[in-house]
Amino acid sequence: MFGPNVVVATAGHPILPELREQGYQYNAPVHIGKNCWIGAGALIMPGITIGDNVVIGAGSVVTKDIPSNTVAVGNPCRVLRKINDRDKEFYFKDRKIDWDEINNNL
């Protein structure tokens, strides 16, 4: 799931002005795993791999690979914590997930 204004960049340019003047650029694929949530305004740089079940915070700039089952935020984006059992119990602060209601609506 992508929030609004997410950028996934696959092209970059070298630092040396002589190469940039000649129009040189490079391309590097970005890999995003399953069940990821990329927050609004996040920027994912070329060559990055984001594992499965990852949450990237809004406005983050992802410059390094992010491992699976983590929450990562910031500029530069860093792993804040692993996704844990509390995440299966609460959806926001102290608001509990009503699993009976969810399962009845499947």
Question: Each predicted region: which residue ranges?
Answer:
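Flexible, glycine/small-residue-enriched loop-and-beta-strand segment within the central core
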Residues: 1-48, 83-84
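Flexible glycine-rich beta->alpha loop in the catalytic core of nucleotide-sugar glycosyltransferases
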Residues: 6, 13, 49, 60-61, ...
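Terminal amphipathic alpha-helical/low-complexity segments used for targeting or macromolecular assembly
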Residues: 75-106
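Beta-rich strand-turn-strand
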Residues: 40-64
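Acidic, glycine-centered active-site loop in nucleotide-sugar glycosyltransferases
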Residues: 20, 67-68, 73-76
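Short acidic capping loops at alpha-helix termini that bridge into adjacent secondary structure
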Residues: 34, 52-53, 68-69
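Short-chain dehydrogenase/reductase
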Residues: 37, 55, 71-73
